[in-house]
Amino acid sequence: MTAVKITPTKLSGVVQVPPSKSLAHRAIICASLAKGISRIDNIEYSKDIQATIKAMQSLGTKIEKYDDYLIIDGTTTYTKQNSEIDCEESGSTLRFMVPIAIVEENKAHFVGRGNLGKRPLNTFYEIFERQNIGYLYKEDILDLYVIGKLK
């Protein structure tokens, strides 16, 4: 077996990604976690994508919205604590944002609508317990408080 060493380095350039809600969630989050300015083209502003944009903004990320692209300043992410994260009805936003909200020490309150609160979050609760992360939730509605930092 050959060992491969990966060295972190600053990337620049353009990546063409087809319009996709699934990829857009990931691109917004990755750009928000990058330590620089990113542009994401071909954005379609569905309700789920808008929920992810607002969720990252609630962590402090500066995001400028234009007709079909975003400018995201990842250097501002995690500048806010006591985050209120409204996932609307987006399961993707919820599942991505729970761990991202506590990469740094934070108090995060997740809310949402529709059937979002009925989705199982037991995997997260098990991780919270193993890592001594405080959490409080209500059954059948999305009203989740998380306090701490992932290890």
Model-predicted segments: where are they?
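Structural preference for solvent-exposed beta-strand-turn elements
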Residues: 1-151
